[in-house]
């Protein structure tokens, strides 16, 4: 009986967690809403008339039931970024991958449970460029049975910061123009914090966000990069930040002056209000790792100490100088040093016996035109921009979603399962690449994984067009980042430096510009799962692929049946 006590204790904890779990019901109405920014009013696509959209707050073990009602003029789907959706790809959301989009006038109810996840995630549209304005935070708190954060200190308050991009025109028009011309899309006109550009933009200072703190208070900042196309540096004037979590996974705490987030990534930091009472800028601006045009403006909000009754001219002047304390736009060394400090809090169970050893080249490319420099060939030297993984530029299907076709056993005409595990040609990936390798093939290709297979992927950046930090997001999974380096990956020497003890767990990771990153995971979640660059111009150029994880043979190892209201194409 003594030997069974640990079992009964675990069983009691499990039952208690089920008793305390809640089901949260929400209605998301997708609609056009007048939004004024930068002196102009635009009819923006929003959820429930809010920009950014509603914040979802739940606990580990809770469930969400969200009915999306499309009253806008575009097809749409919603993705719950970072939620694993165990055996439930039908709730994942990327259009034409796990569902057909919700058409205007239609609706769909997303149902899913937070299973052993807690921290900061977010949700967003996963249809074309609609996530420019359709996004919000998804906060998962610890369960009531164990409600405290495993932080070195307990925060007094929490502040959620959604970093975004704003175009002074309809983002869908920006995308459509780029798709027509083959050129790069126009850059954004502003960055935003919780939808507001801040003091440094026209017609914006009155709406600059202010967050009150008391002297000595410890604040948990939940920072989310919801920008469409830009990695961002973020910092708070004169304040140190202690990183405690990333992508809803706890980390070993470490101190830094600045954090860097790629689109899709989240970082939780603790801030101690230990400076003289005043107003301090929170600021974010671009980290631009590519040889390409970018938005070089800076968004701000204000951290206001409660006992700073007013702002003197001198204090305001000092605050306006704060953005200069952010790193330079192309400071790859700072970005890499920040990412390198990420580690799990303790030893983790990393896959060691690899069943699938995959090598993916990721990068841009150019399609040659029969008649260069026409209206539809406005890319470099009369070409059209593209992007690929292993020389395959992904094409989204239209007549059915991949998951629906896979489940129905009707893949013909929708997708094939011949995605290459390695690039078709070996070359100097980060060197001077022959122009003959700049043009990929097009295809809707998936790669099959056996259930419970242990997977390693080397994501290798290339210098085709430009080297760049590509934030790669894997749907349906979290993975361990076991290694990273510059130049071409060398399996004979680089593998020995892998961190197999306490690597960080992420759902989105950047490939260093001109370098590589190694990730590992166990394929224990059956379904169709998209892997793609979270820079949206890149995914629509084709920087994506799909994993098809087969059903297992045991109990609860197969994909659930699709819901009755699943949209049809």
Curated annotation (Swiss-Prot):
Catalytically driven reaction(s): 4 hydroquinone + O2 = 4 benzosemiquinone + 2 H2O
Location of the Plastocyanin-like domain: 29-145, 157-308, 418-553
EC number(s) on file: 1.10.3.2
Binding annotation for Cu cation 1: 79, 473
Residues binding Cu cation 4, per UniProt: 470, 533, 538
Alphabetical list of NCBIfam families matching this protein: laccase
Known function: Lignin degradation and detoxification of lignin-derived products.
Keyword Oxidoreductase attached: yes
Annotated positions binding Cu cation 3: 126, 475, 532
Family note: Belongs to the multicopper oxidase family.
GO biological process: lignin catabolic process
Species this chain originates from: Arabidopsis thaliana (Mouse-ear cress)
GO cellular component: apoplast; Casparian strip
The name this protein goes by in its record: Laccase-13
Family annotation (InterPro entries): Cu-oxidase-like_N, Cu-oxidase_2nd, Cu-oxidase_C, Cu-oxidase_fam, Cu_oxidase_CS, Cu_oxidase_Cu_BS, Cupredoxin, CuRO_1_LCC
Gene, per the UniProt record: LAC13
Tissue-specific expression: Mostly expressed in roots. Also detected in leaves, stems and flowers but not in siliques.
Molecular-function GO terms, alphabetical: copper ion binding; hydroquinone:oxygen oxidoreductase activity
Signal peptide: 1-21
Coiled-coil residues: none
